[in-house]
Amino acid sequence: MYLTTKEKEKLMISVVAEIARKRQARGLKLNYPEAVAIITDAILEGARDGKLVKDLMSYGRTILKREDVMEGVPEMIEMVQVEATFLDGTKLVTVHNPIQ
């Protein structure tokens, strides 16, 4: 099976997000890479499901809460940008201050 660089990146995000979700389920607070991976993965999957860019921009701010992550992580993640594949092509989804 041949995967492009973008496909490998998406696969890596998915794997990190899955590990992070397992850690979160065990009650652990997420670190920076885990939080970004979960938000990014949710946006990628939402695009695949046919959701609109504007809806994903709003949804991206509801995925994680301040209490889900380690101290200082919300301030480190001012913005998450994801190049996602939608039904009508690839678009950039930007989520500002994703952790409230």
Swiss-Prot record:
Belongs to the urease gamma subunit family. Pathway: Nitrogen metabolism; urea degradation; CO(2) and NH(3) from urea (urease route): step 1/1. NCBIfam families: PRK13241.1, urease_gam. PANTHER family: UREASE. HAMAP family: Urease_gamma. It catalyses: urea + 2 H2O + H(+) = hydrogencarbonate + 2 NH4(+). Its main location: cytoplasm. InterPro entries: Urease_gamma (IPR012010), Urease_gamma/gamma-beta_su (IPR002026), Urease_gamma_sf (IPR036463), Urease_subunit (IPR050069). Heterotrimer of UreA (gamma), UreB (beta) and UreC (alpha) subunits. Three heterotrimers associate to form the active enzyme. It is found in: Cytoplasm. One of its GO terms (biological process) is urea catabolic process. One of its GO terms (molecular function) is urease activity. GO terms for cellular component: cytoplasm. Keywords: Cytoplasm, Hydrolase, Plasmid. This is Urease subunit gamma. Its EC number is 3.5.1.5. The gene is ureA.
